[in-house]
């Protein structure tokens, strides 16, 4: 044993890894839990124009003339323009319903009135540029529809054209004119003869009169040829992931903001599209048509081969709530949605589903009650969550006892959230947005999760990791370091599929023209789409999941001593910071002269008593003291700090090198609910450790920070709050796992190398005869490498046939920065 330890130490402390061999030993009879049939899924939310202008195939922007520049502003002609040739005129006006001039139906609040004076030789044009361009594809057929009424004599043509209107790619005359006083639907098809990702759509008029127009729609072919369906290239990206379930409609999209009218209300999203009112997606800054409605979500899940997982609103939205005592309408809305999805055609809503083209039930088996609504701070849309959950639970259990119910736990600022209630729940939804090192370090996170409730002896709630992604240290769009950290975490969940039966990365989509969140798994524009390295990890893992875990013994030369470099810099500075809070600071051991204070951001001033105050309510207000220089080996600093007003507490900055590299102890962060240590590395922030806690206003606190190498201790009024180690932004090493696919008789071995050194893995198997093997590999030259729309497959999977050494051993090269999936046939 001593010899083995000595050998590992020597190997780990050398530059070593390039030639070191990792031994991965697997006994096919030494089995772990069964893999859950729902283990890998997807999470869809309309963020970054993921729906309108994205997965939803509609090409016309502002098709019903209801959009405006922002929430609360009047509707305008967003997306639409007009042109007139010489000797012709066209004027437009958004009209509202009147008794004499009703609109198409009660949910339409505006239509477009056109006053036209044109001729065959001098036409006028109503133009829509779509969502940052309409993708005209040679040979592709497009379906046009719109509603119109009025007094107009002349013809109407529909065209696809270039931006200047000089080149016409498709043209057809719309039959049925002249129009009359009644609303009529007009349809036509166009076929493009050219390619142009920035094409425009135009209606061309050559007559005289007045027309009211509404609900102008243009559809390309859709995924599985569904009417009102999905953009095929984006939907196919999802299909390739083999999702076992699809969570919808969010995310914050579930709750909405400012008003309950901005929440997802399922019943207004079904039926003919002209009868859907749409609503403001205030959280993400644009209006949604609800073209992807409740029915389309269910249909998409079915088309992907995924079980639907519906998230229901519990009477909370960003900025408001329905009191617990008044929840019944929300509960009724939930039950009606379940009847629509699961009910027989003899039921009210089951019959409605059949009318909409799907007589067979969709069968929702999983329902989440609320979205991130169990935070410790009630201001974070988290009012009396357990009472809300229980009211929904009772009603749902009474009507649908077999549906699995998912509860919310603390969604941010807590690495180990708990269900703090005795109310029964089937699964708990954990959310983690962290850095690559956190995910790699969480490889064994679920090994120790209890499988039974120690007090009752009953099975413990299972875990649904509903949202997770590397959001710090991911680069620009999402790099290989991020993907590999996530891959290691996924392997850990796979090993514990008995307690973590569901998981889903978030978010999926981003239109490059409106990125509200980074990173995202799939990036697109009007004509192109690419997957980040994280997408390929999310695709490869469920494609190669197996049916039962096999226990792995790994002899790893990369082990503990691989990370010998210190995180703490050799020389650094200290300072202060606030986040949406005004605060004051003192340093008893140092005089804070005005010239000693360097403002990075915020409004900082020196007071007459020698203290320093920050008076802005902005986020991330930072000041440093360049005259105080610390030795990275060991230092101790003392402070006094006071919260003066605002949302949070105060922060002590340490290990400050520059604006993009420093640490802080955050007392009273996350809405004054948590203390934490955070590291800012290369401009990206990552959590090191968190703990429940809050800061009182108007009270001076004594703070002490002691740094010894990478160890940090922090005291608040003589109470030791933290004693922890700073972390690298990536964890270097080799990680492995294995499963058996009882359907094919294959052994599937996953090996991740997060380091910059290549190695070789020897896969040694027992009770399993090796006959053939091949490896599916995702690799990059550097951990910071990414894909782009211009180079979408810079990092993408490749396959290689392997030659087994014998019937019990396979050697496989493990490149630096790689995920390797070895499929071994018996």
Predicted stretch roles:
Residues 490, 496, 504, 519-592, ...:
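Catalytic cores of secreted or luminal carbohydrate-active enzymes
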Residues 616-680:
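Secretory/extracellular carbohydrate-interaction modules
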Residues 186-188, 637-639, 700-707, 712-716:
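Short tryptophan-centered beta-strand motifs in secreted/extracellular beta-sheet-rich domains
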Residues 42, 73, 88-113, 254-294, ...:
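Aromatic- and acidic-residue-enriched carbohydrate-binding clefts of CAZyme catalytic domains
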Residues 300, 391-404, 419-420, 426-427, ...:
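Catalytic-core region of carbohydrate-active enzymes that cleave or remodel glycosidic bonds
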Residues 121-240, 327:
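Extended acidic/polar, glycine-enriched regions
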Residues 570, 578-591, 598-599, 619-621, ...:
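C-terminal beta-sandwich/jelly-roll accessory domains of carbohydrate-active enzymes
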Residues 98-122, 571, 602-622, 673-678:
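Short carbohydrate-recognition loop motifs
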């Amino acid at each position: 044993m001593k010899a083995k330890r000595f050998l590992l130490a020597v190997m780990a402390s050398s530059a070593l890894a390039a030639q070191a061999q990792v031994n991965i030993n697997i006994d096919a009879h030494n089995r772990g839990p069964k893999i859950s049939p729902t283990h890998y899924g997807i999470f869809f939310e309309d963020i970054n124009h993921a729906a309108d202008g994205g997965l939803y195939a509609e090409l016309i922007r502002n098709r019903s003339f209801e959009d405006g520049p922002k929430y609360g502003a009047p509707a305008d002609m967003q997306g639409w323009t007009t042109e007139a040739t010489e000797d012709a005129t066209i004027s437009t006006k958004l009209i509202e319903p009147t008794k004499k001039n009703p609109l198409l139906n009660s949910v339409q609040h505006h239509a477009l009135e056109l006053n036209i004076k044109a001729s065959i030789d001098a036409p006028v044009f109503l133009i829509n540029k779509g969502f940052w361009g309409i993708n005209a594809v040679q040979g592709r057929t497009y379906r046009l529809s719109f509603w119109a009424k009025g007094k107009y004599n002349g013809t109407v043509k529909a065209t696809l054209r270039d931006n200047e209107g000089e080149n016409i790619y498709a043209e057809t005359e719309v039959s049925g004119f002249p129009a009359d006083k009644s609303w009529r639907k007009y349809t036509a098809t166009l076929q493009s003869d050219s390619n142009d990702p920035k094409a425009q759509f135009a209606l061309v008029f050559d007559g005289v009169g007045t027309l009211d127009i509404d609900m102008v729609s243009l559809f390309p072919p859709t995924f599985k040829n569904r009417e009102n369906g999905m953009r095929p290239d984006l939907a196919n990206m999802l299909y390739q992931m083999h999702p076992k379930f699809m969570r919808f409609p969010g995310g914050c999209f579930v709750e909405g903001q400012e008003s309950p009218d901005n929440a997802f209300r399922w019943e207004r999203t079904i039926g003919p599209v002209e009868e859907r009112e749409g609503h403001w997606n205030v959280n993400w800054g644009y209006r949604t048509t609800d073209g992807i409605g409740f029915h389309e979500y269910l249909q998409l899940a079915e088309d992907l081969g995924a079980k639907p997982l519906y998230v229901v609103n519990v009477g909370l939205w960003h900025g408001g709530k329905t009191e617990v005592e008044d929840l019944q309408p929300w509960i009724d809305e939930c039950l009606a949605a379940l009847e629509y999805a699961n009910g027989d055609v003899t039921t009210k809503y089951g019959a409605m589903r059949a009318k909409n083209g799907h007589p067979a039930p969709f069968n929702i088996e999983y329902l989440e009650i609320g979205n991130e609504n169990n935070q410790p701070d009630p201001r974070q849309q988290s009012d009396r969550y357990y009472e809300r959950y229980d009211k929904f639970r009772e009603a749902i259990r009474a009507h649908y006892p077999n549906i699995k119910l998912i509860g919310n736990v603390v969604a941010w600022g807590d690495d180990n959230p708990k269900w703090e209630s005795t109310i029964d729940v089937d699964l708990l939804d954990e959310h983690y947005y962290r850095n690559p090192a956190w995910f790699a370090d969480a490889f064994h996170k679920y090994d120790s999760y209890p499988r039974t409730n120690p007090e009752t002896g009953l099975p413990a709630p299972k875990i649904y990791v509903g949202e997770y992604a590397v959001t710090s240290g991911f680069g620009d769009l999402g790099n290989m370091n991020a993907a590999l950290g996530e891959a290691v975490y996924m392997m850990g969940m796979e090993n514990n599929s008995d307690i973590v039966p569901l998981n889903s990365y978030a978010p999926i989509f981003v239109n490059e023209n409106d990125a509200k969140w980074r990173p995202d798994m799939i990036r697109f524009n009007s004509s192109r789409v690419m997957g980040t390295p994280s997408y390929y990890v999310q695709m490869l893992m469920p494609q190669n999941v197996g049916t039962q875990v096999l226990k792995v013994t790994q002899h790893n030369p990369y082990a503990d001593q691989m990370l010998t470099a210190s995180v703490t810099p050799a020389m650094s500075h200290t300072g202060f910071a606030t986040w949406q809070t005004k605060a004051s600071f003192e340093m008893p051991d140092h005089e804070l002269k005005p010239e000693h204070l360097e403002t990075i951001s915020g409004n900082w001033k020196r007071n007459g008593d020698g203290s320093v105050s920050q008076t802005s309510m902005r986020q991330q207000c930072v000041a440093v003291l360049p005259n105080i220089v610390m030795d990275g080996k060991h230092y101790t600093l003392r402070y006094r700090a006071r919260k003066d007003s605002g949302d949070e507490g105060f922060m002590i900055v340490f290990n400050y090198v520059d604006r993009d590299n420093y640490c802080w102890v955050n007392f009273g962060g996350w809405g004054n609910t948590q203390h934490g240590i955070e590291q800012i590395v290369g401009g990206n922030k990552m959590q090191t450790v968190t703990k429940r806690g809050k800061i009182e206003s108007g009270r001076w606190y004594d703070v002490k920070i002691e740094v010894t190498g990478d160890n940090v201790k922090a005291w608040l009024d003589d109470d030791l709050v933290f004693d922890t180690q700073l972390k690298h932004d990536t964890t270097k090493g080799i990680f492995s796992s294995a499963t058996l696919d009882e359907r094919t008789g294959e052994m599937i071995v996953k090996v991740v190398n997060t380091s910059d050194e290549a190695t070789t893995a020897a896969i040694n198997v027992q009770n399993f005869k090796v006959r053939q093997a091949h490896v599916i590999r995702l690799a990059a030259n550097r951990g910071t490498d990414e894909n782009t729309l211009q180079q979408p497959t810079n990092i993408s999977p490749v396959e290689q046939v392997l030659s087994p050494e014998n019937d019990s051993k396979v050697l496989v090269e493990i490149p630096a920065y790689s995920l390797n999936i070895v499929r071994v046939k018996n």
